[in-house]
């Protein structure tokens, strides 16, 4: 990391400030990646006063807040409804996805992995037992094989209720990978031949003794976030209520983030100043268009020495 992050103290002169609100968000990841998200409408720009109606800044709509008298507090309080519960569940799902997204950007991941559980060795229908075995195994690998190991994994449940995990790992040290003789083509595995040898080799993690394992090398780090977040579903959130929905090693820190409210006429000059402060070029861009919000994602990467191919 090159010194401090200059964008933490710059660009405040571009616009007015609203606490918690932003239409540009800048994120600095541990692996030297900078991300700029540009929103078509401000995020979190909602004001709620003492009345039951609150204006929503970016649409001009009004949101009605239902109130009821609470005899225990002698105050008018928000009435929770079925709609509130559904919204809460959706928000929980989105928060989990957002957390996994940001941590999945924090490392230069080397392998996608899938680990299953053998019913003769583990009660594969017991969430706590399966996740405990997996988490302990990763921590043991850090102690014995790869002291700098980074991992991020999420559980997934088979239709029959059995659990397995999907994840990514990096800085694998002396961990052992055995060539399975197969390659990954899309979502399927095929025996390697002269015809398909250019596809990703499927390895097995030799140290995983609780079931079956696969590992394939990451070829596009910008697809890691999409790969790992797709396993976070409504069904998973319901079946793991009150439990952890993802696991990460302690050496994956929180990224550094800052939000700005920038007036439309200042976007170009803001972006120029911001990118100049990074000192690196853009490597990836995508746009996501929604009914009420559109977001442009831009990624910039510091130059770093490539790891030697093993």
Task: Show which residues each predicted segment covers.
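Calcium-binding loop positions in Ca2+-binding modules
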Residues: 164
């Amino acid at each position: 990391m090159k010194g401090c992050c200059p964008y933490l103290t710059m660009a405040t002169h571009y616009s007015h400030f609203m606490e918690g609100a932003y239409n540009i968000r800048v994120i600095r990841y541990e692996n030297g990646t900078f991300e700029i998200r540009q929103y078509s409408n401000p995020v979190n720009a909602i004001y709620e006063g003492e009345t039951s109606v609150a204006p929503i800044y970016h649409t001009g709509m009004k949101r009605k807040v239902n109130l009821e008298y609470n005899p225990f507090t002698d105050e008018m309080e928000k009435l929770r409804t079925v709609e509130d519960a559904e919204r809460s569940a959706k928000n929980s799902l989105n928060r989990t996805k957002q957390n996994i997204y940001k941590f999945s950007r924090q490392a230069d991941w080397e392998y996608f992995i899938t680990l299953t559980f053998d019913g003769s060795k583990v009660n594969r229908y017991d969430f706590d037992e399966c996740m405990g075995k997996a988490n302990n195994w990763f921590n043991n690998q850090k102690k014995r094989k790869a002291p700098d190991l980074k991992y991020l994994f999420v559980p997934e449940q088979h239709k029959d209720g059995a659990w397995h995990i999907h994840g990514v790992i990096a800085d694998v040290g002396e961990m052992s990978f055995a060539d399975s003789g197969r390659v990954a083509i899309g979502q399927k595995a095929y025996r390697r031949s002269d015809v398909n040898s250019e596809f990703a080799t499927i390895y097995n993690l030799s140290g995983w003794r609780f079931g079956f394992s696969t590992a394939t090398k990451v070829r596009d780090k910008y697809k890691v976030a999409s790969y790992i977040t797709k396993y976070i579903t409504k069904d998973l959130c319901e079946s793991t209520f009150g439990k952890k929905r993802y696991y990460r090693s302690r050496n994956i820190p929180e990224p550094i983030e800052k939000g700005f409210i920038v007036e439309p006429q200042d976007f170009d000059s803001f972006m120029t100043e911001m990118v100049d402060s990074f000192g690196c070029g853009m490597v990836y861009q995508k746009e996501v268009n929604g009914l009420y919000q559109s977001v442009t994602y831009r990624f910039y990467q510091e130059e770093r020495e490539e790891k030697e191919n093993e």
